[in-house]
C-alpha cells in the first residue's frame, strides 16, 4: 500500500517522556515532508503548545489542536473550528463545582483560563506546555474549544462517567489517566482526519495514524493503518492494526521507516 498522509498524536506518541522529539524521528518526518507526504500533528494541546514542535519539524503543513476542535493551515489560519455552547459551559461548571480538587482549564484559540491558577494540576500543566494560564474570566470562557479537567485517576474516571451521563451530546474522553477533555461533539481526532482527507485529496486507506490513548481511538479505527504505541493501554492496542515500540523507543520512526523506505 502506498500511504499518502500521516497523522500523529503528541504526548506519549510523537514526544518522548521528556517532551522531546527524538533525532531519529525528526529525520524521518523531514524526509516525508520533502517527498510531499503530509505529516500532521493532531493533539489535545492548544496551538501554542504545538507550535514549537511544528517549527522544529519544518512540516509547513496544517496542525490540529484541541483533539480536532481547531484546525489551522500552514499560515496558522483556522480552516475548521467548533466550540462548546455557552449553555453547556454553565451546566458543566455547576457539576464541576462539586469537585473542588480538580484542575479545570478553558481553552479558546491560543488563550487558556483556569478555574484556579494555584491548583496543583494547573501548575503542572503550565510546566509541561509552557503556555500562560490566566485567571478565570466568565466572558473569555463562555464558549471555549475545550475544557481540560485534571486530577487523580480515580476522580477523573468518576467525573467522566458523570459528564457523559449528563452531556451525551458532547465529546468527552480521557487523553491520559489524569486528563479528561470536554469538547463539541464534532471535535474528535477521527473527525479531523476525515476533514483533512478531503483537504489533502487522499483516501482513507492511504492514511496512517499513530496514537497511545483513548482520545486517539476513533482516529486509529478510521484510517487505513492505525498504529498503537507500545505504551498504550491494552484497549487501544487491541483496536489498532499494528502495535509498535514505545514513545521512548522510537516507535513512530520504526513504522515510518518501514512504510516509507529511502
Swiss-Prot record:
GO terms for cellular component: cytosol. Phosphate binds at residues 43-44, 189, 215. GO terms for molecular function: magnesium ion binding; phosphatase activity. Its EC number is 3.1.3.-. PROSITE patterns: COF_1, COF_2. Mg(2+) binds at residues 9, 11, 212. Its cofactor is Mg(2+). It comes from the Bacteria. InterPro entries: Cof, HAD-like_sf, HAD-SF_hydro_IIB, HAD_sf. The active site is at 9 (nucleophile). Pfam families: Hydrolase_3. The keyword Hydrolase applies. The keyword Thylakoid does not apply. Gene3D superfamilies: 3.30.1240.10, HAD superfamily/HAD-like. Keywords: Hydrolase, Magnesium, Metal-binding. Belongs to the HAD-like hydrolase superfamily. Cof family. This is Putative phosphatase HI_0003. It comes from Haemophilus influenzae (strain ATCC 51907 / DSM 11121 / KW20 / Rd).
Amino acid at each position: 500500500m502506498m500511504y499518502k498522509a500521516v497523522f500523529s498524536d503528541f504526548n506519549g506518541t510523537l514526544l518522548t517522556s521528556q517532551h522531546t522529539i527524538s533525532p531519529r524521528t525528526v529525520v524521518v518526518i523531514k524526509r516525508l515532508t520533502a517527498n510531499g507526504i503530509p505529516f500532521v500533528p493532531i493533539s489535545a494541546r492548544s496551538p501554542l503548545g504545538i507550535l514549537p514542535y511544528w517549527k522544529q519539524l519544518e512540516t509547513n503543513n496544517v496542525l490540529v489542536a484541541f483533539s480536532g476542535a481547531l484546525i489551522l493551515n500552514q499560515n496558522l489560519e483556522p480552516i475548521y473550528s467548533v466550540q462548546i455552547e455557552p449553555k453547556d459551559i454553565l451546566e458543566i461548571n455547576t457539576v464541576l463545582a462539586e469537585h473542588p480538587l480538580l484542575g479545570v482549564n478553558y481553552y479558546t484559540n491560543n488563550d487558556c483560563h483556569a478555574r484556579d491558577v494555584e491548583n496543583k494540576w494547573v501548575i503542572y500543566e503550565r510546566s509541561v506546555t509552557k503556555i500562560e494560564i490566566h485567571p478565570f474570566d466568565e466572558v473569555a470562557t463562555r464558549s471555549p474549544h475545550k475544557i481540560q479537567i485534571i486530577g487523580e485517576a480515580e476522580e477523573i474516571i468518576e467525573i467522566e462517567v458523570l459528564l457523559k451521563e449528563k452531556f451525551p451530546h458532547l465529546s468527552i474522553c480521557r487523553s491520559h489517566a489524569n486528563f479528561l477533555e470536554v469538547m463539541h461533539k464534532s471535535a474528535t481526532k477521527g473527525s479531523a482526519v476525515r476533514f483533512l482527507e478531503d483537504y489533502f485529496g487522499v483516501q482513507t486507506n492511504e492514511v496512517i495514524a499513530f496514537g497511545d490513548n483513548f482520545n486517539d481511538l476513533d482516529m486509529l479505527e478510521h484510517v487505513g493503518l492505525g498504529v498503537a504505541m507500545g505504551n498504550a493501554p491494552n484497549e487501544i492496542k487491541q483496536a489498532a492494526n499494528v502495535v509498535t515500540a514505545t514513545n521512548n523507543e522510537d516507535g513512530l520512526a520504526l513504522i515510518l521507516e518501514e512504510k516509507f523506505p529511502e
